[in-house]
Amino acid sequence: MPACRLCLLATGLLLGLLLFTPLSATGTRAEKPGVCPQLEPITDCVKACILDNDCQDNYKCCQAGCGSVCSKPNGLSEGKLSRTATGTTTLSAGLARTSPLSRGQVSTKPPVVTKEGGNGEKQGTCPSVDFPKLGLCEDQCQMDSQCSGNMKCCRNGCGKMGCTTPKF
């Protein structure tokens, strides 16, 4: 009888794995192309989306602190917020920014980005990274111009890119 109990246990574990495997493995939760811009935190932690598929067209579901919004990937042009028919808040482009006095309202005016030379690369060099580095293991940028202020787009220690304070 112990062998039957092991069979039942193994069957139960396999069934549990199948039930709790993320849908992305089946292709129904495919991530949209592009990289989310670096967004400043939304103060009221509203999650306007959970997955890229919650956003229309080529918009991605991007983290903004404890909240999330649908955002045009890699955009730095001034954008605007709009609501979809399903009530999803969409950020057309730019960086979502709030201030403690704004009561959760979101500004989408981009930061001033000064380009050094004609290629958009900012001054300074990327710092060396100690492996493994703790933090977000996801792409936050693809080029310096997507980072605010004098921050540069550099490797973050897990094979991804993030906005980092450069060395001068």
Swiss-Prot record:
Which CDD domains does the record cross-reference, listed alphabetically?
Answer: WAP (cd00199)
- Name the GO terms of the biological process aspect: antibacterial humoral response; innate immune response
| Location within or outside the cell | Secreted
The record's GO CC annotations read: extracellular space
List GO molecular-function terms, semicolon-separated. Answer: aspartic-type endopeptidase inhibitor activity; cysteine-type endopeptidase inhibitor activity; serine-type endopeptidase inhibitor activity
Residue stretches making up the WAP domain: 31-74, 119-167
List the InterPro entries hit by this protein, alphabetically: Elafin-like_sf, WAP_dom, WAP_four-disulfide_core
Please give the residue ranges the record annotates as the region Disordered.
100-123
Q: Where is the signal peptide?
A: 1-30
UniProt entry keywords in alphabetical sequence: Aspartic protease inhibitor, Disulfide bond, Protease inhibitor, Repeat, Secreted, Serine protease inhibitor, Signal, Thiol protease inhibitor
Q: What is its main location?
A: secreted
Disulfide pattern: 36-62, 45-66, 49-61, 55-70, 126-154, 137-158, 141-153, 147-163
Q: Name one Pfam family in it.
A: WAP
Quaternary organization: Homotrimer; disulfide-linked.
User: What is the documented function of this protein?
Assistant: Broad range protease inhibitor.
Q: Enumerate the PANTHER family for this protein.
A: WAP FOUR-DISULFIDE CORE DOMAIN PROTEIN 2 (PTHR19441:SF34), WHEY ACDIC PROTEIN WAP (PTHR19441)
**Protein name according to UniProt:** WAP four-disulfide core domain protein 2
